[in-house]
């Protein structure tokens, strides 16, 4: 194998199977300083300035002025190039620019999120028969097809290829073994059928989809999922597979990629409506009437993505056992992404949260909003700290450096009431002017204010932010008509994926939902909040963590404000009890407790990984492949291979020529052998 390349080899031996600002004493710039102390400080400041003048370097003044955010393209440029190398891979993704919008880029994002990084990409215009013959399976994004392209796909299937098409045009209906009907369903449900092998292991409840689904009548196809209402099934298929010639053709009656985007990112129509009152727009309000609160405990978008990955593996089962990457590091069943907003809180309050997280071997993200001081005020606070090192009223650069050295993230928490870009520029300048830079790559906006459908994400990506945690479960819209409060996956997901805009363009920033929010559970900031006792709030949080660990497989976002620890008293006691209960639940169920920044590093390495040279040798009964991560990391990931393939069973795995043990764990109807390996090239 190539030097330094990770090369797992699977040998299959033949055997028949049977938030408000926290006001502290620091808000008064002078505090209880005496006139004498002030004059002493002023004199010291003069000496500092004079010294700086001698050396020609006004270091303090220059640093307190702060920086403006760098600007770049917010988009994932040339997203298909990383997978355009058409060397051996089992899956070819054909993106169709005729979709409304084109969703090929987001369909590729789904494959990566599912760990099926063994794919290559081409545009529909580049479709050629000789190219298709290299791939046992073709995945086609939604959009119209001309006659020539349609005939190329027909011949590919007839000669033994497998095709999965997202909402193809009706003139291909016979290829998929269905007959088109005139009606459609908009924003409905599907039910995955346990009776079909592909449907085994999925939730029995009907699942929401968003977008338009075409109605068909079965005409020889096998039904994998059915259109439904909340109350019961409709007489129309949602997902089918049909044996045609020597191959197979599977149909999705709606655009799965766009449905997942809509489910995760909310209703674009509400974004347009709320845009008339931008100050009142908040990310969670995009989900008013959009999510079925009776289904919120199920990650509905994730389950439908898993249905696609299960279908792909099933359709390839006569060609090769398909490897994949597990969702989380070192085989963990989920993650707790631990974060907390802080509003000018003192360092000892920050330590209260960090200490509790560190006691459980975790890391934490603090999103900090300093007061919007001007340069002179920032210089005063920096100087005051220099004069009085014991002062603990304001977070200083030394605190930030020490926290980061301990593995925590100390990031920006911008106020954007004055306008999205104006707020970002101002808070970037203040944050760096206080000596807190560099600005880390993850963020949560104050009050989770949101612009447009994805405008906030677009601006953040432009400034180099790579993960957003603004999608935040809070408010009365999560209360059912009977008064019960709903908690769970309000975006339909527990997985990070990049945002996509209205034109189908992929943004260079991940959406990580925040599922567990102190404001919603112990209710200390907004009128009408549930205000559960800490024990009840822990019980609710623990139930979500348990579901994540036992089959929902999600990265649970946590918001635990720092402010209550600065307020003290009952607020601090309740916050401490709830936070400790959540952290203990994560430990009990095996969820690592990571900061958002650390989690982002893993996500980018995993999502950017590529399986290369995937080859099945039927004579030797061996599967060989290489895995190239986007970047080496000091973490582990898990690579899974089916335990059974045709009449064979996995008996031995080697990595870089050395035997390695594996553990067995099922994933939606398939039993896998999983090996944990360092993320390296």
Which stretches of residues belong to each language-model region?
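Active-site beta->alpha N-cap acidic-glycine motif
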Residues: 296-402, 406, 445, 449
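Active-site-adjacent pocket scaffolds in enzyme catalytic domains
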Residues: 184-202, 206-218, 233-244, 255, ...
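N-terminal export signals
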Residues: 14, 22, 39-58
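A glycine-rich, often tryptophan-bearing local segment used as a flexible ligand/cofactor-contacting loop or short
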Residues: 144-214, 218-219
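Helical hinge/lid and interdomain linker segments adjacent to catalytic or ligand-binding clefts
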Residues: 93-175
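Surface-exposed beta-strand/loop patches in extracellular or lumenal glycoproteins
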Residues: 630-647
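Catalytic grooves of carbohydrate-active enzymes
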Residues: 294-298, 320-323, 340, 500-598
């Amino acid at each position: 194998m190539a030097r330094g390349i990770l090369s797992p080899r699977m040998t299959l031996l033949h055997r028949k199977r049977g938030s408000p600002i926290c006001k502290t004493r620091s808000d008064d710039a002078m505090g209880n300083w005496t006139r004498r102390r002030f004059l002493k400080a002023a004199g010291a400041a003069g000496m500092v300035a004079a010294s700086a003048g001698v050396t020609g370097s006004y270091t303090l003044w220059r640093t307190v002025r702060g920086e403006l955010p760098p600007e770049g393209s917010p988009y994932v440029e040339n997203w298909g190039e990383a997978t355009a190398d058409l060397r051996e891979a089992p899956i070819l993704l054909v993106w169709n620019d005729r979709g409304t919008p084109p969703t090929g880029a987001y369909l590729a994002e789904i494959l990566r999120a599912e760990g099926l990084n063994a794919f290559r990409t081409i545009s529909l215009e580049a479709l050629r028969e000789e190219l298709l013959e290299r791939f046992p399976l073709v995945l086609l994004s939604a959009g119209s097809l001309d006659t020539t392209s349609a005939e190329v796909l027909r011949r590919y299937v007839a000669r033994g290829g497998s095709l999965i098409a997202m909402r193809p045009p009706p003139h291909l209906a016979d290829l998929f073994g269905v007959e088109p009907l005139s009606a459609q369903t908009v924003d409905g449900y599907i039910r995955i059928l346990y009776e079909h092998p592909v449907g085994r292991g999925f939730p029995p409840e009907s699942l929401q989809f968003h977008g338009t689904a075409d109605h068909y009548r079965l005409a020889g196809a096998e039904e994998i999922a059915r259109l439904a209402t909340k109350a019961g099934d409709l007489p129309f298929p949602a997902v089918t597979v049909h044996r045609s010639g020597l191959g197979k053709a599977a149909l999705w009656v709606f655009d799965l990629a766009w449905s997942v985007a809509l489910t995760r990112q909310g209703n674009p129509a509400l974004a347009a409506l709320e845009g008339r009152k931008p100050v009142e727009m908040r990310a969670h309000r995009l989900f008013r009437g959009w999510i079925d609160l009776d289904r919120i405990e199920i990650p509905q978008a994730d389950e439908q993505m898993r249905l696609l990955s299960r279908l792909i593996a099933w359709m390839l089962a006569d060609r090769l056992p398909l490897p994949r990457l597990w969702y989380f590091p070192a085989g963990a069943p989920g993650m707790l992404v631990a974060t907390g907003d802080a509003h000018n809180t003192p360092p000892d309050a920050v330590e209260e949260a960090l200490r509790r997280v560190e006691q459980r071997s975790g890391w934490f993200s603090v999103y900090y909003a300093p007061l919007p001081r001007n340069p002179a005020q920032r210089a005063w606070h920096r100087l005051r700290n220099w004069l009085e090192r014991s002062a603990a009223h304001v977070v200083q650069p030394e605190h930030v450096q020490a926290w980061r050295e301990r593995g925590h993230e100390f990031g920006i928490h911008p106020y954007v009431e004055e306008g999205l870009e104006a707020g970002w520029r101002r808070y970037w300048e203040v944050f760096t002017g206080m000596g807190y830079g560099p600005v880390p790559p993850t963020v949560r906006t104050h009050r989770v204010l949101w612009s447009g459908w994805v405008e906030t994400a677009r601006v953040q990506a432009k400034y180099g932010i790579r993960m957003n945690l603004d999608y935040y479960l809070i408010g009365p819209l999560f209360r059912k008509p009977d008064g019960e409060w709903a908690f769970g996956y309000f975006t339909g997901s527990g997985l990070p994926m990049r945002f996509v805009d209205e034109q189908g363009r992929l943004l260079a920033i991940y959406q990580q939902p925040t599922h567990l929010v102190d404001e919603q559970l112990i209710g200390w900031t907004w009128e009408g909040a549930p205000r559960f006792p800490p024990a009840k709030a822990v019980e609710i949080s623990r139930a979500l963590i348990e579901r994540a660990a036992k089959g929902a497989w999600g990265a649970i976002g946590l918001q635990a404000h720092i402010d209550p620890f600065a307020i003290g008293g009952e607020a601090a006691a309740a916050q401490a009890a709830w936070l400790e209960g959540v952290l203990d639940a994560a430990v009990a169920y095996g969820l690592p407790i990571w900061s958002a920044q650390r989690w982002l590093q893993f996500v980018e390495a995993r999502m950017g990984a590529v399986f290369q040279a995937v080859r099945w040798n039927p004579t030797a009964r061996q599967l060989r492949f290489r895995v190239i991560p986007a970047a080496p990391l000091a973490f582990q990931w898990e690579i899974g291979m089916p335990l059974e393939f045709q009449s064979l069973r996995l008996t031995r795995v080697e990595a870089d020529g050395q035997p390695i043990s594996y553990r067995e764990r099922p994933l939606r109807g398939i039993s896998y052998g999983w090996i944990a390996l360092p993320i390296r090239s």
